[in-house]
């Protein structure tokens, strides 16, 4: 049995007993029942994930993956492809968006190269390179089935390494010029909607180029004909190495009963791949923010996820997931430290 098969078979639903115990305490807190809103939802979900109403969320990490994309040659992104190579080392150095925010919220960042188009090893970056970028999905499959499984299993492996280091909350992030194109293709395939409905500007594509980007995605879907019910098939035909690796983190976290915080648009696509491999993974996901990218609503509707934040962000990197860490920690602190009606005489 492969690692992917083994992990997928070990994903179970949340612990309802712990959820109920947490709800009972929440209902006794000195506040109108339910008035803490999503704070209460977070606490109940975390209890169900950990199988314990006395859960710990103090040690947090963003796992970020980077890869380049053959479809870049179709003119779907405005920036030079070598930006991936130049920017990604800044993740672990704490110099970019996710690095700075993670530092502020007390989270670590693990940066992993799974497919950057370069030969050199990058400073502060783990080297798990599958190859130097995917193939052009507008001309054929982005990767082989074996490569798709490999990037999923890399994600599982990195997640389990972090869990062994006692990280209790894991967020996902990414870097890859042109990676909104495969992400949009994944969302289009799974939602069944036309690519133009879910195609956005990514990292700053001019609006007059949107139609071209959608046409490239449509062509890729027509040529490759991915099976909308098969996560591995979709990933191999129109995905990306960093997208598959993020999906692997979701699978690894779910099998090990660890909450996984989803970032923005690219990670929605990864979440959909994980969901197609095992629908129970959705129960372990916390959506950090509502991405400003087109296609967001389609993806979140399928996953039935309600983001914690709406910040008009479309940076990616894991920046939104890092921001959400503080909300998760504050929710846990509130749950554990607020007084109950049993403890204080409120005249009830």
UniProtKB/Swiss-Prot annotation:
UniProt keyword annotations, A-Z: Cobalamin biosynthesis, Glycosyltransferase, Transferase
Q: What is its EC number?
A: 2.4.2.21
Keyword match Hydrolase:
no
Query: Per UniProt, what is one GO molecular function of this protein?
Result: nicotinate-nucleotide-dimethylbenzimidazole phosphoribosyltransferase activity
Functional description taken from the UniProt entry = Catalyzes the synthesis of alpha-ribazole-5'-phosphate from nicotinate mononucleotide (NAMN) and 5,6-dimethylbenzimidazole (DMB).
Q: Which NCBIfam families match?
A: cobT_DBIPRT, PRK00105.1
Q: What is this protein called?
A: Nicotinate-nucleotide--dimethylbenzimidazole phosphoribosyltransferase
User: Where does this protein come from, organism-wise?
Assistant: Clostridioides difficile (strain 630) (Peptoclostridium difficile)
